[in-house]
Amino acid sequence: MKTTRTEAIILNTRDHGESDRLVGLYTRSGGRLQGIAKGARRSRKRFANTLEPCSLVELQFREKGTLVWLESCKLLEPFLSLRTELIRWGIAALISEIVIEMVPEGDPQPELFELLKETLRQLCEDKDSLNVALLFIFRFQDKMGYLPALENCGICGRSLRSATKWCWQVDRGLLACPDHPVERVRALELDLGTLLLIRQCRSLSLDRIWRLRFLHDTKVQLFYGLLDWVRGHIRKELKSLKLLQQAHST
């Protein structure tokens, strides 16, 4: 049976049976996978401190049915700073849940792996966790093929730079200029500067997008508007959002 060694990010874990643990993974070579760590709850040596969510590890596994069987796991980066602040941890958990819910299993996307890894690193270093989350979601939308061009009005074709105010229906991928009133219940009202910033999330290299900064007044609207889009796409609530809302209320 073929054995594979690869870098991976632990997305989530849960107990399975009396001694095992199920592990959600995003791997560099195999994309999103579901693994089982046999005896992980009993052995203090084999997987000690290596299966914590939002950790970067090096895995050795073999495929067996619908699960991969974890043979060994070496901790590369625990991203400890995520665990020192509830808001950081809540956003990291939310990002992991988005990947679990929206990325199909067994579809390798090395660029998505790098995006996830770098996002966790930025969450540790950047004081503006919400800005990091927005940059991740927009880049994620682009890599998954959901982010529209945002170059002109989707109704009349008016160019983006010809107006300062726009309306973006995220669930439909429709950008509308002021000449075309659209249903605003599920739409984001954005200015030209914000739209140009979103477009830069697509065009800049990964190491440069973290310099982009959304205005304070638009970040919250964008964040919850995008989460509405995620919930509409997966057709259920995001469990980790409750943790994040709890963190903001404390």
UniProtKB/Swiss-Prot annotation:
<keyword id="KW-0234">DNA repair</keyword>
<dbReference type="InterPro" id="IPR003717">
    <property type="entry name" value="RecO"/>
</dbReference>
<dbReference type="InterPro" id="IPR037278">
    <property type="entry name" value="ARFGAP/RecO"/>
</dbReference>
<comment type="function">
    <text>Involved in DNA repair and RecF pathway recombination.</text>
</comment>
<keyword id="KW-0233">DNA recombination</keyword>
<keyword id="KW-0227">DNA damage</keyword>
<comment type="similarity">
    <text>Belongs to the RecO family.</text>
</comment>
<dbReference type="Pfam" id="PF02565">
    <property type="entry name" value="RecO_C"/>
</dbReference>
<dbReference type="InterPro" id="IPR022572">
    <property type="entry name" value="DNA_rep/recomb_RecO_N"/>
</dbReference>
<dbReference type="Pfam" id="PF11967">
    <property type="entry name" value="RecO_N"/>
</dbReference>
<dbReference type="GO" id="GO:0043590">
    <property type="term" value="C:bacterial nucleoid"/>
</dbReference>
<dbReference type="InterPro" id="IPR042242">
    <property type="entry name" value="RecO_C"/>
</dbReference>
<dbReference type="GO" id="GO:0006302">
    <property type="term" value="P:double-strand break repair"/>
</dbReference>
<dbReference type="InterPro" id="IPR012340">
    <property type="entry name" value="NA-bd_OB-fold"/>
</dbReference>
<protein>
    <recommendedName>
        <fullName>DNA repair protein RecO</fullName>
    </recommendedName>
</protein>
<dbReference type="GO" id="GO:0006310">
    <property type="term" value="P:DNA recombination"/>
</dbReference>
